[in-house]
A protein has these predicted regions:
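Bulky hydrophobic segments
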Residues: 1-141, 147, 156, 170-171, ...
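Pore- or pathway-lining transmembrane helices of multi-pass membrane proteins that form conduits
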Residues: 160-164
Length: 272
């Protein structure tokens, strides 16, 4: 049995699970990257991430050209902007820890997997937006897990690097029309208001968390975020049905962040 023999929903579920598995894998790969940095020097991670990114995108481009439809030329602006985002992410990493540059490539890959999962239900710009947002939110989970790890630290800067990797990758995959079909998509104002609510809720959680290092994170910082799914469940009929899968995915990724203030209350766990 291959993944193609599964139903679209089963394929999407498998892809989502792979995204979720990759986050703790990424968190626990840091000792490997650190060891390689010790052996080969910091210059190794100054050079390696851009090389991997170029090779990965080049490989995807080659595959795209092999199976390209004449009616779907490459969107050079989208690809160029995506590459720019990725290189900004590479430059934005802490210069004292060049090993962290690998996060750009990691989250570009997660965005690609999320794009495949969502492509069964979304198309066009909504597919770009929701897959990139999903990857970026998993990057936030990554940082909270780092904060709970005894040998890591929570940081907004690294979160921004993850975001740039996800959105940069998303723009590249969009420009290459990967897992995409030409179908019209509409977005209502209620969808935009709700997504804005989610964004504010996430910011109200992640920004104050910086000041709780070594402390128990107060649950109040997650209250605005927890209110969002309640509103969605009550008024879900007025949301745009065509993008409901994207809204549900990013809502789940965002609202599940509320578990971290609770985890900081467990004995033996120090958030830093």
């Amino acid at each position: 049995m291959t993944i193609r023999s599964l139903s679209p929903r089963a394929q999407a579920t498998a892809a989502y699970l792979l995204c979720l598995i990759l986050v703790p894998v990424y968190v626990n790969m840091f000792p490997i990257w650190k060891y390689l940095s010790t052996v080969f020097g910091d210059i190794f991670f100054v050079i390696l991430p851009p090389v991997i990114l170029v090779l990965f995108v080049g490989g995807v481009l080659w595959i795209h050209f092999q199976a390209r439809q004449p009616s779907q030329p490459i969107d050079r602006k989208s690809v160029g902007l995506g590459v720019l985002f990725c290189f900004i992410g590479l430059l934005a990493t802490d210069p004292d820890f060049p090993v962290k540059r690998v996060h750009v490539v990691e989250y570009a890959i997660i965005c690609l997997i999320a794009r495949y999962a969502m492509s069964h239900f979304l198309h066009g710009l909504p597919l770009l937006f929701f897959s990139a947002c999903f990857g970026a939110l998993l990057g936030v989970h990554d940082e909270f897990l780092q904060g709970l790890h005894p040998a890591r630290t929570y940081g907004l800067r690294d979160m921004g690097v993850n975001l740039m990797g996800s959105f940069g990758g998303g723009l590249i995959w969009h420009g290459l029309h990967l897992f995409s079909a030409k179908k019209p998509s509409t977005v209502a104002s209620i969808d935009l208001y709700f997504l804005g609510w989610l964004l504010v809720g996430v910011l109200l959680l992640v920004w104050p968390a910086v000041y709780y290092r070594g402390l128990v994170v107060d649950i109040w910082v997650a209250v605005p975020l927890l209110a969002a799914p309640v509103y969605y469940l009550i008024y879900r009929e007025i949301f745009t049905r065509e993008i409901s899968q994207g809204i549900l995915a990013v809502t789940a990724a965002a609202v599940s962040l509320a578990i971290y203030p609770l985890l900081t209350r467990l004995p033996g766990i120090v958030f830093y």
